[in-house]
């Protein structure tokens, strides 16, 4: 990936994971650039298919583009940071991320509400630096 494209992804996201919203400065593991539609699914390495992701979100997401929603009994696409509005699909309930079907499935597949991730967000909330504005 060329440096200019990498810089675009970082600046567009303002150094914040585009899935869980945790800023890089509070995560000891370097963020990664995620192919929203994985290369193995013929997703291009282009600005409209790339998102900044923390290691955990990117690792959990893998090549997935959808998940099964137990509430609607339907296969639902994962949140796409280039096409979907974060605030339409997600909302914070304290340190836990909740959402409508796309948000709910994304939270599940990316394991966004795992205990260690909630603990980090609680600490950041207590310090007054989360969620990002």
Question: Predicted segments — roles?
Answer:
Residues 37-50, 82:
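Short linker/helix segments within small regulatory modules
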Residues 3-4, 23-26, 59-133:
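Extended charged
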Residues 2-31, 51-61:
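Short cysteine-rich loop/turn motifs with clustered Cys
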Residues 37, 54-56, 101:
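Residues at the C-termini of beta-strands that transition into short coil/loop
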